[in-house]
């Protein structure tokens, strides 16, 4: 595997494999993607993506864990939506992310929320967008960095 286009160096010594996953259907509806950014085992930021698997243009929104929209985005212009519905199972998704992220300084836990209320696991990653995404505005980089606390360094 070559790492010329991204910064996913944590995979460099892992033998490449092909993994086939079961297709996730959502009763004919959009598949809502929730990427939960966790720092030291605590969810802090949610990236909600919709229209990702449809013919419409993908939309993404960053939110805090109280479902307040944050004023930044990655790779696409900022879009504010005052009427973004809070998922009924948000607390359950945050609990899952909290459990899975224990022991990691910074990790993103990806989950899917289905129309029947079930939650499906997507992945965990240490390098969002392979570590090369462009945050808008630039101050979002500082905000994300401020959430990382390294024992022995921050003390």
For every predicted segment, state its role.
Residues 22-24, 38-40, 113, 125-128:
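Short, flexible loop/turn elements at secondary-structure junctions
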Residues 8-19, 60-119:
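A long amphipathic alpha-helix within ATP-dependent nucleotide-binding catalytic cores
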Residues 16, 24-27, 31-35, 43:
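Contiguous hydrophobic, core-forming segments of folded domains
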Residues 33-49, 60-61, 120-125:
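Beta-strand scaffold of nucleotide-dependent catalytic cores
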Residues 51-54, 127-129:
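Short, surface-exposed beta-strand-loop junctions and turns on beta-sheet-rich folds
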Residues 113, 118-155:
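C-terminal active-site "lid" helix and adjoining low-complexity regulatory extension at the edge
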Residues 55-62, 131-135:
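A short, polar/proline- and glycine-enriched secondary-structure boundary/capping micro-motif
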């Amino acid at each position: 595997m070559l790492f010329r286009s991204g910064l996913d160096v944590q995979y460099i010594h892992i033998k490449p494999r092909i993994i086939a996953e079961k297709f996730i259907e959502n009763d004919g509806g959009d598949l809502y993607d929730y990427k939960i950014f966790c720092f030291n085992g605590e969810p802090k930021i949610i990236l909600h993506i919709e229209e990702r698997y449809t013919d419409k243009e993908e939309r993404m929104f960053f939110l805090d864990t109280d479902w307040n929209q944050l004023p930044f985005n990655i790779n696409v212009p900022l879009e504010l939506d005052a009427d973004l519905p809070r998922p009924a199972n948000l607390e359950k998704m945050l609990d899952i992310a909290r459990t899975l992220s224990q022991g990691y300084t910074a990790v993103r836990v990806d989950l899917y929320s289905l129309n029947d209320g079930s939650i499906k696991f997507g992945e965990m990653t240490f390098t969002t967008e392979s570590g090369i995404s462009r945050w808008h505005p630039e101050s979002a980089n500082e905000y994300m960095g401020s959430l990382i606390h390294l024992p022995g360094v921050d003390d």
